[in-house]
């Protein structure tokens, strides 16, 4: 599922609109991830509190959204642009790549909640395809 030039433009435009609330979306998406998929908490066992909405979860959610925004700037070469992040997640953090898809789903839910008018079916499709490509790029070094 490749991204068309229209998809890329839609993603860039939506993420531009979303920038004012990106920290909230990242924090809420990671909070939802650990609530809905509690097995993901195992990656954060070194945190004192990995419960939904806790300070470490919010902080890391914000960090993740920063990475997603970085990926938007590398939308024409996600695999090449995110190679170091792929290596980090594969070799050091050892995150199961299925979790990238789970987090992407949580992000879509949060985006639609925060921007119900702007999150049209066309935006939904484009952002979903982008997050799927992002997940593939992060999983590149697992092969």
Curated annotation (Swiss-Prot):
Gene3D superfamilies: Globins
Keywords, in A-Z order: Acetylation, Heme, Iron, Metal-binding, Oxygen transport, Transport
Binding site for heme b: 89
Positions of the Globin domain: 2-143
Keyword Metal-binding: yes
Tissue: Red blood cells.
BP GO terms, sorted: hydrogen peroxide catabolic process
Pfam family, one: Globin
Gene Ontology MF annotations: haptoglobin binding; heme binding; iron ion binding; organic acid binding; oxygen binding; oxygen carrier activity; peroxidase activity
In-chain residues carrying the UniProt-annotated modification N-acetylserine: 2
GO cellular component: blood microparticle; haptoglobin-hemoglobin complex; hemoglobin complex
Binding-site residues, O2: 60
PROSITE patterns from the UniProt entry: GLOBIN (PS01033)
The keyword Transcription is annotated on this UniProt entry: no
Domain of life: Eukaryota
Subunit (UniProt): Hb 1 is a heterotetramer of two alpha-1 and two beta-1 chains.
Family assignment from sequence similarity: Belongs to the globin family.
Role noted for this protein: Involved in oxygen transport from gills to the various peripheral tissues.
Protein name: Hemoglobin subunit alpha-1
């Amino acid at each position: 599922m490749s991204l068309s030039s229209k998809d890329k433009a839609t993603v860039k435009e939506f993420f531009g609109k979303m920038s004012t609330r990106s920290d909230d979306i990242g924090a809420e998406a990671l909070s939802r991830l650990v609530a809905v998929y509690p097995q993901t908490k195992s990656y954060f066992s070194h945190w004192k509190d990995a419960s939904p909405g806790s300070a470490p979860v919010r902080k890391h959610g914000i960090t993740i959204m920063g990475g997603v925004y970085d990926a938007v700037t590398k939308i024409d070469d996600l695999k090449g642009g995110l190679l170091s992040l792929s290596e980090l997640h594969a070799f050091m953090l050892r995150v199961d790549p299925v979790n990238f898809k789970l987090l992407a789903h949580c992000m879509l839910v949060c985006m639609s909640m925060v921007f119900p008018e702007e999150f049209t079916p066309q935006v939904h499709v484009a952002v979903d395809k982008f997050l799927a490509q992002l997940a593939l790029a992060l999983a590149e070094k697992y092969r």
